[in-house]
């Protein structure tokens, strides 16, 4: 009887564990405010507009005290990348996991920030992952697909950016993270990335090779998480900056991707219950949106934390001169409910 009870308890524990980490595929849900996605802990949002649909790619936080990986790198256990989409910002679809760092032969794990962009009918997913021993730290990789929903496959079989290609600076072996890509008005794609140092380089038209040398963009209080965007004749380099003890969001502007970049100050404050914050902005159906994450979601008995974050969204606005108005972080977000 004791053996039977033990088996039952073990089975129940396994079911409970599976339930708490489950991400439902192809499910529809309503926007009920921030946090926006409530079926999983999500972080590092990245947006892509394809026709009438907005896609939001996220990292999947699974940093649980009683789970393998809790003592992972710096308290984070970001296991894979998830995908959500919408046509109206109110009804959303969860596509579930699209792929994981371990799908790459050169990577050992850690699904840090990424961005998907379209070029010549293909979808390129620029990502951060932990390289295996020969690469000595975080790397920027690139995957490719015929659809924004995947499946994605490794485009080149090795990292696009690895540790030996950049000056380690203050962040050592994890400075090559958080890639963002934007196409210039002449069709040149530009890659920007970095922790501690903001790196930038043009890409070749094939999206899988650098077209020129890597440059450094000097930005005040720069930490990580760059995001490139364009509106009219203005280019925007939005980035994570250091605030009063935790991260904030600042930005710079330029008339050219080649610079110079003029620092413009903060546009968002510190995230609630999270040391980190990560920006993504986009225009969708006539409105501009600012995506970020905080640590306010409670899910399956687990409270939000620095390693259990949740994606949020606010509408953002511009001044007449093209500068960005400060974005307030709210519980309502853009929900109609």
What are these regions (language model features)?
Residues 1-27:
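Bacterial Sec-dependent N-terminal signal peptides
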Residues 17-337:
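Carbohydrate-active catalytic/glycan-binding domains of CAZyme proteins
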